[in-house]
Amino acid sequence: MEKIVLLGYMGCGKSTIAQNLSKITQIPFLDLDICIEKRANLSIKEIFEQHGEIYFRKLEHEMFLELLQSSENAIIGLGGGTPCYANNHLLLQRDDIVSVYLKASIDTLYNRLVHNKSKRPLIANMDEEEMKEFIAKHLFDRSFYYNHAQHKVAVDNRTIDETVQDILDILA
C-alpha cells in the first residue's frame, strides 16, 4: 500500500502536480476536497454555508483518515487548511505514507492566484495588496503545520515536470 500525500497553500500546484504524478506512477489521484463533496453531496462552499467550518473540518479529518486507512494505493491532495486542524499534521509523519509539502513563496502564490481568484472564495473579493497580505499571513500561520511533512519540494521557478521529477526522486 502506497500513500503519497501532497500538501501546501492554495495555488502551490497540488492538483496539477498530483495529476501528472498519477499519470507517470499509475497511482490514482484523490483530491480530498472532491472526496468530501461526494460524501456530503454538497460543494465545499455549501458545506461551509449550511453547516459551518467546524462541521467541515470534522468531515475533512474523517475523510483524510479513511483515505489513509484504505488498502488502495493513492496520491492524496489535501486542502490548503487540512494539516492545520484536528491534528492532521501529525498524520503526515506516519511511516506508511510519504508526505510532501509543495513550498511556494508569497510572490509565486500571488502570481498564480491573482488571475483566477474568482474561483477561490477566500480571496475572490480582495484587491492586490490585501491578497498579498492575506497570503503572507496565512503562510506564516500554516508553516508550522506544513513543515510536518516528511519532505519539502520548492516549486518557485520550477516547471510542473521538474517538480514531478523532484517527487519521483523522493519516491525512488
Curated annotation (Swiss-Prot):
Residues the record lists as binding substrate: D33, R57, G80, R142
Annotated residues for binding of Mg(2+): S15
Cofactor note: Binds 1 Mg(2+) ion per subunit.
Cofactor(s) this protein cannot do without: Mg(2+)
One Pfam match: SKI
UniProt pathway: Metabolic intermediate biosynthesis; chorismate biosynthesis; chorismate from D-erythrose 4-phosphate and phosphoenolpyruvate: step 5/7
UniProt-annotated location(s): Cytoplasm
Binding residue positions for ATP: G11, C12, G13, K14, S15, T16, R120, R158
SUPFAM superfamilies in the record: P-loop containing nucleoside triphosphate hydrolases
InterPro entries named in the record: P-loop_NTPase (IPR027417), Shikimate/glucono_kinase (IPR031322), Shikimate_kinase/TSH1 (IPR000623)
UniProtKB keywords: Amino-acid biosynthesis, Aromatic amino acid biosynthesis, ATP-binding, Cytoplasm, Kinase, Magnesium, Metal-binding, Nucleotide-binding, Transferase
Keyword Cytoplasm: yes
PANTHER family per record: SHIKIMATE KINASE (PTHR21087), SHIKIMATE KINASE 1, CHLOROPLASTIC (PTHR21087:SF16)
Function as written in the Swiss-Prot or TrEMBL entry: Catalyzes the specific phosphorylation of the 3-hydroxyl group of shikimic acid using ATP as a cosubstrate.
UniProt record similarity statement: Belongs to the shikimate kinase family.
Protein name: Shikimate kinase
